[in-house]
Structures are given as structure tokens and as C-alpha cells.
Amino acid sequence: MKCVASKFNMWLHLGWLLGLLLVLLPLVRCQGWGEPRFETGNVENISLAAYNEAQLQQDVWMVEEMDAPFVLLYINYQGPSEPTIRESPADLDARLQLSEGGRWSIVINRRQDYEVHQRSSLILLAVESTAIPYAIVVNLVNVLDNAPVMTAQGSCEIEELRGDFVTDCLFNVYHADGFEENGIGNSSTNELSFEIGDVAGARDHFTYVPSTVTPSQPIYNKLFNLKVLKQLDYTENAIFNFITTVYDLDRTHSFKMSTIVQVRNVDSRPPIFSRPFTSERIMEKEPFYATVIAIDRDTGLNKPICYELTALVPEYQKYFEIGQTDGKLTVHPIDRDAEQNELYTFTIVAYKCHNRLLNTSSEGAIILLDKNDNIPEIYMKPLELEFWENTIMELPFDELVIHDRDLGENARYEVRLAETVAGVQQTTDSFTIIPGNGYQRVSFTININNATSLDYELPERQTFVLHVTAHEPIEPTHESTQPITIRLKNWNDEVPKFGRDEYQISVPETIGAGELLATVTVTDRDIDDGIRLFALGRLAESLSVTELPVSAEPETNLPLYGFEIATKVGDIFDYDIAKEVIVQLQAEDTLRTAKQESLHQIFSQLTITVIDVNNKPPQITLPRGTMHILENSVPDSAVIIGEEQIAQIIGTDPDTEAELEFSIDWSNSYGTKSGIRAKAETYENCFYIHEEKVNRQRTIGTIRVNPTFPLDVDHEMYDTLFLVIRLVDRNQTILPNTVETVVAIQIDDENDNAPYFDNSTLTVVRSVKERSDSGVTIGNIIAHDIDGPGNNEITFAMEPIDPAHKGWMNIDDNGIVRVEGNRSIDCDIPPIDKVLQNVTISDWKWSNWHVFEIVLMDTNNKQPYHDPFPNDGQVYQFEKIPSNTAIVRVEGKDQDRDVPYHTVSYEINYRDFPQLQRYFEVDSTGRVYVKENNDLLDRDAGLESIMINIVMLDNAGGYDIQNRVSTNINLTLLDINDHTPKLPELAADELKVSENAKQGYIVKTPFAALDLDDKRTPNAKINYYIEEMTPELETPLFSLENIDEYNAVLRVAQDLKGFYGTWTLKIKACDRGSEYEPIIPLTEEPKDNCETRDYELTVEPFNYNTPSITYPSRSAQLRLKYESLQNGRPLVETNGSPLPKFEAIDDDGGIYGDVTFSLTSTNDGEQDHEVFRVDKVDNKTGLLVLENSLAVQPFPKNYSITVIARDGGDRQSEAAIHVVFINMTGEPAFLEPTFDTDFTENEEGRDERRQLPFAEDPKNAGLPPGAETNVYYFIDKTYGNASHLFQLDRVSNVLQLAQLLDREEIPTHEIRIVATNNENGPPDTVLESSPSLLVVRIKVNDVNDNPPVFQQRLYAAGITTNDRVPKALFRVYAEDPDEDEIIRYELVNGTAVGENLQTDGLPFRLHPDSGELTLTSKVQPNQNGYYQLTLIAFDRDDTHNDTVPAKVYIVSESNRVTFVFLNSVEEIDQPDVRKFLAQELTGAYEMECNIDDIDQTTASDGRQAGGSSSALTDVRTHFIQDNQAVEASRIQQRSSNRTFVTVLKTTLRTRGLSLQDVPPLATEALTEADETLQIILIVVSAALAVLCVILFVAFFIKIRSLNRQLKALSATDFGSISSELNGKPTRNVPTTNIFSIEGSNPVLNDNEFRDRMGGSGGGVYDDLSLQSEESDFNDVDRDIFAPKRKESLNPALLEHIRQRSLNPMANGTDKSNDGAPTSNHKKLDETDDELSHRF
């Protein structure tokens, strides 16, 4: 307020005197003040409240962390007094300062921290009077200057398969600026936000939500729970490890924390088979074992797996078993042949043993392999056949089947037939069996294919045996044979007759086999007839009928057929069944007449009386019901059934003379007690059988107690006897004569034994705890009574020996001892160790007793305690107490009985006070001391005092209850100067300064070192120095100045332009510990502690630099595994290690050094980069991952991509790389399928080596040497026929010879190389298309090891006087099998044989290269004979040579024969063709033929006049016989034979030579003049002859034409024969088609046809006749000598002819287009008019 107003108010209210005093005071105080009294110069950070004049108080609010020094406020005072600060907090370091404008200001020299300093301070400012100061209240305003800190409250584990819920994973966020409402800058409440790093989809799965739990110090802490948004899957991610970034208000500060979330596996997935069973082929009738393994897909739980097997066909379940827990599959032996099945399918179900619903199944199958264990079995009905003799038929079998129950080749068999005739077995040609082989079960037929041998008149054929044999071709021992009896039938017409009507005999029932029963005779009047006798009825198969020799009946002399009837087998009669047996006898004759009558059959009977014989064993009949007897029964007591019925055992025998006797077989009898065998001596002979004989065939036996048995029948020894009862027939002579049976006899019990205690129950120790509850079981007492049920029921009673123990325990009827009184047992006061109890046992008849001890067990029911501590446990010590320093001793006590319970142990309560575990321990005596290797008790770390919680406990080492009592000790720590000031670890951003920074620019303020000592002492006050800067400069770039006792400011000392780079400042900070004076004496002298630290200050440049990619390098190839590719997952190199991160360097700072990677395709038009992406890892690295794994193609696909590294300033660099995905399972591959190389033949090639190309292993693509997977090379032995000639180093792939080569034998070889990773060799089979194969073509280099060889062994030629000089006579040719040989020819010598021949020099020259022999001088007419020459061919090095003779004959032209061929010179003039031609002509004419020359046929020869072909070649030859030239006439004479020439042509055509002619010998040469004249005469004669012929032909044709024209001009009657009109024409006439219709007018002119022709000219135009050129009216109006144009005629005459002529040609216009317009000729359509028909 203004001073005047204050004075006026005081005057009015307080009176004059008081008013005067008051007026004087304001006048003094208001003197020199302006309005407002206080103001701020920093309205953004400092605000002032309204001045309170009543209290002389000015409130000031300023934000924290303002750079000191700064002006707090200005004082608008200009008075005479000098303001002073009477009082101010040291933290403010407030000072008065006079500004340039003359105003006073209060300057704060220390930086203020809301979280450290006082939040409200008072400054007393004295202006006019020190007694009445102005109060300036300074309030700090909190600003957001601290980063949040996030910590996890324990581990985080979340169950899977549950979504959208809040977990119990708790996280605490601490913020030093707090969370008070409107507590930050008076503007807003601090708010937190979270960001989850998107690693493995964590951002989609989790979020943070506020927790309902209230944290400690909620102003600074907030708790958050992790919420699951999308359910987790343990199989996809068992652990999430992601970065959580927490931001405070407006994302001002952040904090990153690595968050680990463990997914808890939930039991929800079915098992999966890790070793399934699919199918197996096993041998039948053999067991098979396998193991099936399934694992829990919930791998975190790994629950046990159970197994179950179900056969698809329930009937086959019996063959399969599987272990429920071990998965052991057992297949029992299966008889495939019996089941007739090879495939057995089943399902194996694996399920979790605790939850059957979680299961998975797998289909399995067993395929049985057949075992060849069955032979072919023949099933045949009947086995005997009768059929008519000499008849083609199929044998009438009801069944003829062969069956082999095996499978496959084991079931194949072959069938053959044989026959036994007259006792001799032989192959048969009479029968055939169809088919001849079979498989498994096949029906067969047997046919007669040769009936001539089946002749009844042959005695051996009347009855014979046919054998059917089946055998397996693969196992000859598997064979079966079935004989068939074949009987041939004859015809008959007489009825046979028995000798008697009835036959009677008697036989014993035991008659044996082969015994004669009766002789039967039959007579038959047929001649050559026979009788067969049959025994009919049931015994027919058991009797044999034997035919006796045919004799004559004495009376009638008829054939008498006798038969003996005998037994086939023994024991066919049974007296007890039938005492008399009647057998029907049937006799049948066997002869049929041509009438085909039926066979005659007669009957008789044989009556057999059976005589009884004792031959049957006896039988035993047991009674119904249970047989039993009471134990201890008196002798002769009988075994009974039911209550009193005596058990009777009945023995019978059907034989009449039987003598039966019972007995007991004690050696096979036995007794049991409760199913256990009893000792034989306790029951043996205890019973005997009392017999009562009813008759000889029946005896009754009863089992009785044996009087001679020394013991009693005892139920306690055995409760059941199993007796073997034997019945014997003493009179039976035929064994067996006995029968046995087993009977069971129960031994009944009676109460004859007293109960007794079990031995073990007498020695067992029983105990009970004191204070046990009622009903607690102490133990049980076991007693036995060996009597049976009803006699062994035991009751128990118990009484304590000491009456004081009554009511503590009781016993029930089962012998169980329990606590009776509730918590009534006490063993502590007084101490009691055991209780004695007398237990009595009894049944209804007997009793027994025993005293038992029951031990009492002490319980820990007394609490430990201790005496009080002095000073209530308060202890003082200096901080950092040494180890083993004692703090206090605790003495505990306890009143329990047992030593463990009253022995007190000590421990520190680490559970509730985990901090104590770092510092203290307590020993068994209660001594509390500082532990060994303890954490320092550091007061400067905030531990000014600590409470030690000591726990006393008894029973420390036991497993029972422990009683715990705790007590506290309070320890106060005093400070020592044990900390060196820790210079701050400044972030790079804090030490970065722009290159444009100017002098005085503050780099860091405050620059504060941290000294953990007590800030209230000099131990924490710090001085700062810059000791050194590197690199060194004369003038320092930076300065460091203290701004208070704790902080300094780092400034730029000069402009930084041009000083870009990193500068290291060595800064030293020292505390003032030497000034420290503690309350208690220190153990050491105080001193100052100093620390020096290097700081790197970065002077940030402008963005002058471009990022440089360090990985991958340019043109690098990244080799990645093709297996298990997933989108977004790290890629793996072929060596199994993860692909390194992409990295680039950029020396620029900030965003200019923040590099981001991107990709593009290197090649235009390709999209290789779309398969990948680069995930950013940090500012210099990125991770290459897949964007689309399904589109990835393996090697040889090469992804060409360009990696782009771009910094924040849009500068970028690129690196083109290649990415290949290697299939690590691929085989090596050659780049080319073939390779050519060479080796030298002979010894020269033995030491040669050839490096073959290496195979490219896809697994080695791009690998450096030494890192590749080894590739081995082998020669494929199965390829070609040259592999044995070579050997190959399998590692180096170097090829060398195994055998020497011969190029002349084989010039090239071909082998195949197989590349593989298997060092033991290639696989057995390799696909022909496999790239692992390399075909090596080997050329054999030649060595000059062969001489040249002439193609011919003799060369010959002929020369004449007409031969030109020089003339090539012939060309020699030598071949050298060596390669690239150069042959040199040489004429070495020669001789002349004949007359007048040169002897001094031969007239020949041999070209050394071409081998051509040339005539060098002309042959003289007086020379004759021949030259004998020797020619030599040398090879390149003159190492080898060959010699051949040559002859040159001097012949005349009459000796030369020219053969003309339809071939070119090049086709014939070849050495081999010349040789062939000379040989063939020599052989054909039987004279030596020599070819003189070969030349093209010239036109002057006259043979080309026809111009048929230009490829005619003359081969001039001469023939030599006896060294003399043969006249050509002889050759031409021979050539006149057409057959000879045809054969010769055919022979020559085999080499493509077409012989055309053998010209005759040319006449002798004429003189030149004669020759010219002759030619002229011939030409003139020929011309005259041609003219005569032309004239004759012309006149003949003209006359004929005129005759036709005259005849055509004459008119004939229409329809007459001569007109040939209206009838069938016989010649082509132009008007034939026009006037062929009756009624047409033949006399027409062109006017009538003008309209038809569509123009002004012409009439009917018969183009058909005209085109045929066969019309008789052609050229009828033309002059013979005129040209063929109508214009040549006189126009008047032409018009006259047109008007009168019938010839349409005359009426038509001229068709010539020679200079005239083309006539508009049109062919008439057939439908235009009936006159237009043409044929």
C-alpha cells in the first residue's frame, strides 16, 4: 500500500499520539521503496504472490533445477540503507547483488533439487532495520526431471491357453518426482505409459494395467499387473523376453527393462509319437517285438504315457499285446496258413495315463511272410476207379483237389502221373492230368489220352495203380503221392451162383489182422468171365476178400471162383456190442457182351458168432457231491457226502471174467493247506479203501480212516486231500487193465487249538506322542488261531500295569490300540518314557496274555525364552564393521523333556528381514556377529541404523514342530570417510556439443560428483579440477568451475569451430575429509579422497558422412540353411550359427549416426527383396529375417539384393549381396556333365596325372577353403568297360592310369565319376540323371610306335607316247596308325627292263608329301618294256618306314581301255577306291589291271550329246599279263558279254561305282586337214537329210488335213449314219455337243448364237473339242503357210466363211490377244440351255 494511505488510516484509528508514532514508522519504512516492492525478472520459472505488508512477507515460487547462479527477485528499493541478508539457508547460498540499473537483487548460487533440498526456505532480508526484517519465503516447484525406474516384484509365470485376464505378475514403477496430484510444475499429475517391444509377438500378447495392490510410499511408487490379451501357447514360446519401456508424463523420460515371462505349460495336448509303428514284415509262426514311444506334447509337464492296442478284426486281438506303460509291442506267433490272412492291421492309442481323453492314435500293420512249412496235400475221392477197357474218357473223381496252404512261391507245385503195372512203377502215356501245375488250392482232372494200352486181355492191366504226385519245384522234399487203384471191367451175360446160400463161422472178439474168416466159392458160365466178391455193410472196409485161383467145378466143370474172406485189421469185433455179426456178400461178374447188358449181381450172407474175451479196462464212477471228513476222526471212519451219506466209489468192468480191486496211489496223491502243498508224512496212508464186491463186474469202495496211521487227520496240517484212486482188473490179460481218477476230500475243522500272539507282534516297538488326540492309533497287536472259521475268532482286552495310566489307551476287537483320553498323555512333568499294558486274547474256548511296552514320544510344546538385554538392545558401531565382530550374545532356555526339544538354537530372521542375510550371522551359542564375506555395513548407502531380528528355536535339527521366539537388536552406524567422490557417468548426449558452440556455452551443469558419505560432513563436500585434456592444445577448449560446495559447471572456453572430434578431459574431484571431526574418535587420521576420470566430449559435426556398411561386405554371399524357415525368425547359416546382424558405421553423431537398413532387388524387374526384411536392432545393426518363407527357393536360386544403410540425414550407402539357401541334405553336383582329358599311350602315360573337375557340393557353396564338407570321388565300376584301366584319388580327384593304354587299339575311353560325401564309396544305385555323375572322355595321345604301311603292296601304271609331260601316273598312300603323322615319300632306286629305256636317270619324280609319281620325260616311240621302282614311306621322325615296289609299263594306245563311270572324279580318285577298282577289274578280267589316270569326260567324246549328266568320269587303264601289255580289243571283246558286264556292274555298285560303258577302241588319228574335211562333209550331209525329212513330213500332214477339210464341208442328212448325228458319235466333231438333241437345226449362223456368247461376236464355241486338239475341223479355214492368226485371212473371205460354215470356229471371234482386246469368252453353264450340254 502507499505510505500516504497507511499514515491516514493509522491517524484515524489509534489516536493522535499513537498515530504520530505509527506515522513516523511507515514514513521511515516506505522511504525509498517502489511498487511493487519485489518483482522477478524470470516470469517463466519464478512467480511471486501478492506482498503481505502486514507480515512483511513475500512468497516466492520457483521451479527446481534452474542453472545457478540466477536472480531470485529484484528489490525495488532506492533508499539510503544497504540491504543485507540476515539469515538464509546454506542450501540456497543466497546473496545480495547490486545490478547495473542500481537495483538490488537476491541471487541464488546453488542449484535447487526438489527431491534433495528443502522444499520451502526462509530468507530474512534486512533493509531499513535488522530488527524488523522482510520475510521472503522461497517455495520449490517440482518439475519433471527424473526418469522412472521399473522393477519386477518377483518372477513372472503365466499359464498358457487363457486369454484376456490380469495375471499376478507385479511390477513396481518408482518416480522420484512422485505422483502427487498437480505436483509437477503446478500443472499436471505425473502419468505413466508403457511400450512393449514387439519380440515374438509380445506386444500382441501383453499389456500393463494398474494393480489393486497399494504400494509402499504410493506417492513415489505405482504397481502394475501384466495383463494377457491373447492366450499364450507353450509350444510356440515357452519364454517371452522383451523390453518394456516405461514413459512418464508426455513421454519426457523413459526407462527400459528386460522383462522375462515364463509360460506355464497346461496339461491340454495329446501325446505325439516319436517312434511310431507303421508296418513290419515278419515270418509267420514267430514272435515279434518292437517298442512304440510317444511323448507328451506338453513338454513342460512330460506326463507318463500309456498305450493301448486294438486290432481292426477282433478275432486277431489275441495275437497282439502292448505294454501299458513301456510301449513294448509283442506279436505272438501267427499261423498264416491256418488264418489264411497275411495282413493284420491294428490301432495303437497313446494317451496320458492320468487323462485318457488326451490321446492320439497310430495305424500299424503286420504283414506275414510265408514259411514253407506245408506240403501239397492231395484230396481225392474215390481212391479206386473202375471203367471200361479201351475207352477215352475223363476219370470220374468226385473230388480231385491239391492244396498247398503256403503262399507265393511256397504254394506253387507241379503235378505228374505214374503207374504201377505188374509191380513195376513207370511213367504213363495213357493218362494226362490237367493242369500240370497249381497254386494253393486247384481242382484237377485226369483224362485218358491213350486207351489202346488199357486192354482187359492183358492180365497185368486188369488191375493196376495210378500214382498222382505233387511236388514243390523250390523244395523237392515237399512231395505227396496218392495212389489210385484202377480196375478194367469186362462184359458178362450169366448170373453167377454162390456155393452156399449162407455161411456161418465163430471167431474170438480179439481176432487179429489177416486172419481167415471163410472161403466162398462162386460159379459163372461165361467164358473169359470173372467174378468179384464184395463184403457189404459196416465191416466191409475191415474185411479183405481174396480171390483164389480159378478151378473147375467137379460136377459141371464150370469155372469155380473161390474167395477167402479175412480181416484187414484187428479188434473189429466187440462181444459186448454185438454177439453175432452178419456180413452181406455180393458176387458180380465182370464180362459185358455187345448188347451192353447190366452186370449180374448175386448176394449171400456170412454169419459171424463172436466169442467173448476179457480185453476191456475197468471204469470208475464217483459219487456226486463234496467228499469230506471231520479232523481227528476215529479209525475206520468213512468219508461222507453231505451230512451223513457215505461216499461210495463204484468200479465196473463189462468183461464177464473181471476181478476188480481198488487202491490208493499215495505217490501221486497230495494234500494242501490253503492251496499250499502239505508235507507228505502228515497225511500219507491216513486213508484206505474198504471194498464191497457186488459181483465180478461191479465193486463198491468207501474211503475210511486207516487204523494203522499213527497220526490224526488234522485240519491244521491239510484242509484238502487229492487222492489218486486206482481200479485194477486182475484177470485182464490185454493191457491196459487199470484206470485211475482223482478225488478231493475236504478235512473239516474243530476247535482244538488256543490262540497265540504273533512272534513279530511281541517284538515290535509301539509308541505314541504325548498330548495326542483321542482315537489316534498307536499300533496293532496280531494274534492267531490256527483253527478254522468259527473256531478262530479272537477277542482282545487290555489293562495298564500302572493305575496312573488308566484312561490313556484302549484296545478294540481287532487288536488296534488307540488313545482313549483326549490330550491326556503327558511325558514332560514328570518325565515318563514308556507305559506297560497287559493284553489278553481269547476265543470262545481258549485264552492267552502278554505285557506290552508303549513308548511315549515327547512333543515340542514348550516355548524357548531369554533374559532381558541391557540398554534394550541398542548398539553403536562405526560403519563397515569388520567380519566376526560380535554384536551381542543371546542365551535361550526351554523346558521340554527330550534334548532336541529343550536345546535352543539361534538364527537370524532372514525371511522377514532378508537384508540381514547380507551382514550378520548367529552361532549355536547365541553370539550375533558380522558374517564372513559380508556385505559392507555402509551407512553411506543409506543404512544409518539396522534392527537385527534374532529367532530362538528348539528342535532345530528335527522334523517335528519347532517353536520360534524372536527378539530385536538395534544397531546404529556412524559415518567414516570411506568413499571417494564418484564422478558422474555422463551419457553421450550430455557430453555432445555442436561444432557451432561459442565461448561460454554451458556443456554440463551442474557437474556433480557423487560422494556417498554424509552430506552434513566435509566428507561429502567436493572441489573440482580439469587436470588434463587430450589431444593437448595450447589453449584449453573447456573450463570447470565450482558453483557451490557440491557442484560445478562445465563450459566451453573458446569457440569450437574447426575442433570437431572427441576430446578427453581428465577431471579430478576431491572431498574435504581432512576437515572432518566426528563425535567419537576415528581409528585413522582423516584425509581427502580424490578420483580422476576421463570424459569424452564429442563435438558433433554436421552430417558430412555417409554410413559405411561393415557387414555384410559388398558382393558377399550369405549361405543359409534351407530347413526350418519361419517368418520373422532369425536365419541360420549353414554351419548352424545364427546369421550375424547387419552392421554399418557412421562417425556422425545423433540421428546422423542412426543407421536404418532396407532392401531392394539388385536386378531390375526382379522381386528378390520381397522375400526378406531387416528388423532394426539398434542404431547400427539390423537383423535379416524372412518376410515370406513359403516363397523361398533353395540353391541354385541366388537372391540378388542390395542392402541400403541410411542415416538420419538421408545419406545412404549400398552393398549388393547374394543370398542362397543351402539344402544341407543335397549331394555334390558337377557343373558340367562331361569332361574331356587325355593320357599318353604306352610307358609314357604311366606317370601322368590329370586333375578332374571338382563337384560343387551345395552344402559348400561360398565356403572358404578348408571349411567345406569333404567330397569323395570314385570311378563307377558299373559304367562302360574302361573303369579297370584307371585309378582315382578319392580326395584330390586326380586320375591316373592303372594299366597302360594303346591308342592304336582303342583311341578313346569313357569312364564315369561318382561324387559323394561318403568316404566309403558311392551308393549302390545312382540315378542316371543325378548331377553327382561326371562322364570323363579320355583321348589317348599317340606315341610314334608304329611304322607307316602302304595301302597297296604293288603300284603299277602305263605310259604311252601320247602322254603329256608332266603327267601324274599314280599316287601312293601309306597309313600310319600313329596320330597326326606326316608321311614323307621317297623314290630310292629303280631299274629299267626293256629296250631303249633310260638307265642313267629315271624319267619319274615322286612328290615327297602327296606321294604322286609324275612322268618327267616323254616316252619315245622306240621304247618298250617297263621300269621297276622302289618307293619308301618315312614317318615324321624317319623312325619307321615301309617299302613297296612299283612298275611303270610302256604301252601303246591300243593297250588302253577306258571305263566310263557315272561318278565324279573326286568319288573315284581316292586310294581305297582306286585299290578296290583295280582289284575288281583284275579279278574280273583275270589279268593285272593298272589304272593310268582318272579324268572328267570331255564334251568332244560324244557321249554327252544327250546331256543326261555332267558327272561322267573316264578311268583309263591297261592290263598286264606276263609282264606284257594286253591289247584293248581283248578287254573290249570280253566286255561285249552282257552277263559279264552285268555282274561287273553289280560288283562295282557295292562301293557306289556306277559303270556306264566300256567304249570301243578309237580309230587311228587322222591328219589335221583330213579331219577338218571329214567334219564338213558330215555336217552338210546331215543338214540335207534333215531337210528332206522335214519336207516329206510337211507335205504328208498338209494333204491329210486338206482331205479332212473337204470331207467336212460336205452336208449330210440329219440323222443319217454318215452324219453321226442323233446317235453315238465315233469321232470328235465340233458340233457333236451342240446338235446332239433331236430337232436341233444344224444350219446355224453366228447371229443365232450371238446372245449366248454375251457379245457381238462368235457363235457356239466348242472349247472341249478345241482343247482336245482332236477336232477334224482344226485349221479348216487357214492357209497351210499362213501364221495361226485369223487376221491373215482376207476379211471378205473370212466373213463369207463365217456366214456359211457350220464350223463354230469359223463363227467365233479370234481368241488371240496379240495386240487386240481380249475377247469376252465365256463358257456356258450346263443349265443355260439344252443346247449347251457337253460331254
Curated annotation (Swiss-Prot):
Q: Where is this motif: Toxin-binding receptor motif 1?
A: 1344-1350
Gene expressing this chain:
Cad1
Q: What does this protein do?
A: Cadherins are calcium-dependent cell adhesion proteins. They preferentially interact with themselves in a homophilic manner in connecting cells. (Microbial infection) Binds to and is probably the functional receptor for B.thuringiensis subsp. israelensis (Bti) insecticidal toxin Cry4B. Trichoplusia ni insect cells stably transfected with this protein become suspectible to Cry4B; cells undergo oncosis, they bleb and ruffle after 20-40 minutes, swell after 40-60 minutes and lyse after 90 minutes. Following toxin treatment in the T.in insect system levels of intracellular 3',5'-cyclic AMP (cAMP) rise 12.5-fold; EDTA but not EGTA pretreatment prevents cAMP increase. Inorganic phosphate also rises 3.4-fold after toxin treatment.
Which Gene Ontology cellular-component terms appear in the entry?
A: apical plasma membrane; microvillus membrane
| Protein name per the record | Cadherin-AgCad1
| Organismal lineage | Eukaryota, Metazoa, Ecdysozoa, Arthropoda, Hexapoda
- Looking at the UniProt entry, the stretches that span the membrane are 1575-1595
Provide the membrane-side ranges marked Cytoplasmic in the record.
1596-1735
Native organism is: Anopheles gambiae
Give the chief site where it resides: membrane
What kind of membrane protein is this, topologically? Answer: Single-pass type I membrane protein
Q: Where is the composition biased (Polar residues)?
A: 1701-1719
The keyword RNA-binding is annotated on this UniProt entry: no
